UniProtKB/Swiss-Prot annotation:
Residues 133-158 bind DNA. The gene is NFYA7. GO terms for biological process: negative regulation of DNA-templated transcription. Disulfide bonds: none annotated. InterPro entries: NFYA. A motif (Subunit association domain (SAD)) lies at residues 103-126. It comes from Arabidopsis thaliana (Mouse-ear cress). GO terms for cellular component: nucleus. Residues 1-33, 147-190 are annotated as: Disordered. It is found in: Nucleus. It holds the Pfam family CBFB_NFYA. Heterotrimeric transcription factor composed of three components, NF-YA, NF-YB and NF-YC. NF-YB and NF-YC must interact and dimerize for NF-YA association and DNA binding. It comes from the Eukaryota. Residues 177-190 have a biased composition (Low complexity). This is Nuclear transcription factor Y subunit A-7.
């Protein structure tokens, strides 16, 4: 056991010596011992500290937007944390950032764009209507408010609505019976 540890340490030492000889040909690659310290310094570094890494150059530049005189793209030498199994914390989006529907079909999308363009054109001509109703027909709005909704706020159809009412009535009955049995058990023990 100890001999294998010594062989391993000797092997690492000879590997480091060879790296020092070849250092003028290639940039040094971090060894396995330094791997943990690199990962922890990348993950736990504060944004205001001086040892934080600057973002590297984008590895895949588009040749159409690059100048003729610009230097050719260099290979990306940064550390890919996703490939090492380290998860980065994402920046949470503000809750009011998404004001539009997320899923629309092609016709709806083109209709939305067409309305935005016409509204922008009217605003540029100062002909925009100041007070717009949020909905066109009051009765349709009231009906939509009263309709039961399912997962994601979508309207339920009649078949699913009946199942939804049966499930909720069944749950209420089971909750009532469980509550009565619990009260009977507690009154019987005291």
């Amino acid at each position: 056991m100890t001999s294998s540890i010594h062989e391993l340490s000797d092997n690492i030492g000879s590997h480091e010596k060879q790296e020092q000889r070849d250092s003028h040909f290639q940039p040094p690659i971090p060894s396995a011992r330094n791997y943990e310290s690199i990962v922890t310094s990348l993950v736990y570094s504060d944004p205001g500290t001086t040892n934080s890494m600057a973002p590297g150059q984008y590895p895949y530049p588009d040749p159409y937007y690059r100048s003729i005189f610009a230097p050719p793209p260099q290979p990306y030498t940064g550390v890919h944390l996703q490939l090492m199994g380290v998860q980065q914390q994402g920046v949470p989006l503000p809750s009011d950032a998404v004001e539009e529907p997320v899923f629309v079909n092609a016709k709806q999308y083109h209709g939305i764009l067409r309305r935005r363009q016409s509204r922008a054109r009217l605003e540029s001509q100062n002909k925009v209507i100041k007070s717009r109703k949020p909905y066109l027909h009051e009765s349709r709005h009231l009906h939509a408010i009263r309709r039961p909704r399912g997962c994601g706020g979508r309207f339920l159809n009649a078949k699913k609505e009946d199942e939804h009412h049966e499930d909720s009535s069944h749950e209420e009955k089971s909750n009532l019976s469980a509550g009565k049995s619990a009260m009977a058990a507690s009154s019987g023990t005291s």
